Amino acid sequence: MPPVRNRGGRFSRGRGKGPRGQTNRRNGFTTSRVEDVEPEDHSDNESHLSHEPAGDEMDHETQMDDVSSDSDDDEAQQTARPYNELIQLLQVNAEPKGPARKRRKVEHNGGEKRDAVPAANGEEDDAVLLGDDDLQEQEPSDEEEEDHPKEADGKYESDDEEDANDPFETHFSAVDESELALKIKSAEEKKWKNTKKEIGSGLKLVRAIPDIGEGDVSLLPAMKHFSIVKLKKKLYGPATERIPAISGDAQHIAPYIFGYQDVLYGARTTSNSSAMRDILAVHAVNHILKTRDRVLKNNSRIAKEQDADLDLRDQGFTRPKVLYLLPTRQACVRAVESITRFFQPEQQENKKRFLDSFSAADDKSWENKPEDFRELFGGNDDDMFRLGLKFTRKTMKYFSQFYNSDIILASPLGLRTIMDQADAKKRDHDFLSSVELVIVDHADALLMQNWDHVGYILDHLNLQPKEAHGCDFSRVRTWYLDNHARFVRQMIVSASFITPEINSLFSTHMQNFAGKIKVTPVYAGAISEVPLPVSVKQTFSRFDSLTPTKDPDARFKHFTTTVLSSLVRNITSSRDKSSAGGTLIFIPSYLDFVRVRNYFATSSQTTNVSFGAISEYSEVREMTRARTHFMNGRHSVLLYTERLHHFRRYQIRGVKRIVMYGVPENPLFWGEIVGFLGLDPAGVVDAAEGGVRALFSRWDALKLERIVGTKRVGNMLREKGGDTFTFV
């Protein structure tokens, strides 16, 4: 099982490859207290476990955004270097290291090409699958040499005419340098002008542009088809055939995507994820093809006009232009499938190796798991991977070395392991120096892995390289040389919901001079969608917390003095021990879980309370035993973490009342956890009377909105007359 977010070793993982629920970590602390009681008639108790597979117009909006404002100070300060100093620095390291051996390619049926270099011992080990040679540079293949215009006697003709109104041109090439400088200065000083609007489809849009004292901020009109998008002709046919009309949320976001503005989309669902993935693939491939087309045109022009003094700036320091950050290998497969669907290469090199190592069949035992769980963990759910894609005129190559790649797809863990190696001499992030489009898909899933890896990668984007890597500095765009690439780069982040960590990307890493937009849904509230046949009392208790750093202590004090004292009194004073049990305590944070677990084990207040505690670190047998004891009444209380529920989606039986130490980040979890009250049909009425009690503070504003609804959350955060709110 994965370690907690931002905890563990140097490269702590999310959910890794291998047996689900297995871990070598054992808690050396008392994690439960068992009470011997007379068993009731639970003839099917064990069967329930053994057959289950292991596995901002609103008034409060400003307050919500302030939750992540402290992270602004963490932004990496980057110092621009003078042009001459940069040239001298890089030329020192420009000594050739000798070309790698050119690989002979063998044609296979189906138009696929595969490397003819055999793997050691006849099989690929983990190092090969991860691509330990990702940073090695190779000579171009025969096909690439033929495709290069220099070898074509300077003859190169494009199938597209240049358009001065093309966002690709206006954003990267035809930029007024004085205006760009003003916008960059405003972005550096965090001076943004914004507008907020709620549109009829149930979305809240916040658009911001650098404040240079000109004009007002307005929203762009919806984009309903590709006819107004400046696409390469090669893409237009497949795009319009696959997506004849842009609908839903995508029509409101597409203008900003194709306009090269930063996008934070917080309404990702299993139903709209495929459409969004296709639109992003069209945009990514369009950017790659236009970048390549511009370079080839200028190469041809230089070959024809060798005596002319041409100043053609069309490149970055290195080749990779698009970076995908994805949670699992199967998510990578889906992204690549979208890319190939629109690029339609005549040949795909190493495709079989890619499918063999990245794709897998879904687990059939998960048919009863929630849809979002099956989407995230279906197929190959390994979170340790990286992949380079290289595009030529007719071919797409998988597993290309990063410095020869156009698109890099990776998990945060997989990419960081190659960037931040133990040997300082092997550390390298120059391949990220010229990334112009970053796509972070399913950011909430990455949050449940190790968010520190995401921050590390983003902090190392668009830094000036330490080596030249064969760069022609006379062709490098001036804003690269001025160390301003991060203000031109486009970042697109999609998430099922927005947390303070994800929200901080909007304020810290989204600095696009063209502007940025944040899209969030208007929430009806998870409390209105509880899957129970009877109404259940849902009580929310607010406690005072001065700062986010003091919030854990304030929460713990409120829980032990107010909630737990009442809970212990009810358990110990009840004559019927079986009815006294059944209390599930749901704890979002693992650190809070450890603190509460230790308190239950050592405090005199809970001496007479039998309890169990299971988290994402618990072994399967520990979890099974604790759930069985809880269901049989031997545990009166069960402590249960949000990350364990994220990775397992257990159905906990025997629940008669629920205490939420904090509301869950994922609003779907509210209905699933409260639904535990109805798993025993005979006791559902009694369980509904036990109800749910949840603790919250002002720093829970973002996730509280998802639980109680957009219309209710403002009053609950500001209410002066009381701190308890009950919904039935």
UniProtKB/Swiss-Prot annotation:
Enumerate the residue ranges of region (Disordered). Answer: 1-172
Highest taxon, organism lineage: Eukaryota
Cellular location(s): Nucleus, Nucleolus
- Residue ranges annotated as compositionally biased, kind Basic and acidic residues, are 33-54, 107-116, 147-157
- Pfam family of the protein (one): Utp25_C
Please name the GO terms of the biological process aspect recorded for this protein, alphabetically.
maturation of SSU-rRNA from tricistronic rRNA transcript (SSU-rRNA, 5.8S rRNA, LSU-rRNA)
Spans of biased composition, class Acidic residues? 67-76, 122-146
Basic residues: bias regions? 7-18
Listed GO MF terms: rRNA binding; U3 snoRNA binding
What are the protein's UniProt keywords?
Nucleus, Ribonucleoprotein, Ribosome biogenesis, rRNA processing
Q: Which InterPro entries match?
A: P-loop_NTPase, UTP25, UTP25_C, UTP25_NTPase-like
Q: Which GO terms describe its cellular component?
A: nucleolus; small-subunit processome
Quote the biased-composition stretches of kind Polar residues, using this chain's numbering: 22-32
What is the purpose of this protein? DEAD-box RNA helicase-like protein required for pre-18S rRNA processing, specifically at sites A0, A1, and A2.
Assembly and interaction partners: Component of the ribosomal small subunit (SSU) processome composed of at least 40 protein subunits and snoRNA U3.
By sequence similarity, the record places it as follows: Belongs to the UTP25 family.
Name of the molecule in the record: U3 small nucleolar RNA-associated protein 25
Organism of origin: Neosartorya fischeri (strain ATCC 1020 / DSM 3700 / CBS 544.65 / FGSC A1164 / JCM 1740 / NRRL 181 / WB 181)
From the broadest rank down, the organism's phylogenetic lineage runs: Eukaryota, Fungi, Dikarya, Ascomycota, Pezizomycotina
